[in-house]
């Protein structure tokens, strides 16, 4: 639950990408950002699903690291002035959302594979309730950081993604083959 909780930031970060490099014109590039997000969902579901079936623990690690890296890359694009270029943030968002798809796939597979068959619904209910609370907490954290701007939020989200990915490393392998 701790790994999933830390990686919830991958679901909360995309609106902050919209705010980068745009100022008043941030919404003008929204179509490209939506296209990047949809393409990542399409491309990622098959690949991450197959990899999660082999090792959801490794997918949680890898997708946490990728999310941290691409959030950091977005921050670097903003501070270097590249975020205002029409294609930069959509490309970074595509890869960030690809990592989010990895988190989504692996967290579900890990939960199903680790829980005894007769207790899966109880495990899922408990995990989903805990994640709901953690989403509120990480959302509030992101909101507080947003007072300093989207860069601060993305830095915080990158740190939490990094922590979530690293915390996935010592998890047990639970796949059945």
Regions found by a protein language model. Name each.
Residues 27, 117-127:
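Loop-to-transmembrane helix entry/capping segments in MFS-fold secondary transporters
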Residues 102-115:
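Intracellular juxtamembrane helix-capping segments at the cytosolic ends
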